[in-house]
Amino acid sequence: MKRVLSTLIFVTLLLITWPACQSNQEVRIDDDDLGGVVTSSQGAEAGVWVIAETRDLPTRHIKIVVTDDQGRYLVPDLPQAIYDVWVRGYGLVDSEKVQTEPGKALNLTAVVAPDARVAADYYPA
């Protein structure tokens, strides 16, 4: 009986804690959003800017969001257009611009700056 009870307790604890152990980095987006995960050679990039810019509209349109602690981002409610999207942040150099449109998931790769001087050229303190 003790063994059954201890097994039952173990399984219950496992089921309770399992979702917290999962690295669920998927970002849900709809037809007018951009979203994804930003990573670098050092893993998920928390607190960096994701910039989406277009000149396909009557005026230039830019939205900037910040990644969460798992590197996830969501740029919501964008007008339909082709956007240049890139990453900027402390200790990074600007990533290459990627063209995309709303409604698509886009994972981005941040580029770690080789030294503090180069990083300051992109993101001064």
Give the location of each predicted region.
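Short, acidic Ser/Thr/Gly-rich low-complexity loop/linker segments typical of extracellular
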Residues: 28, 55-72
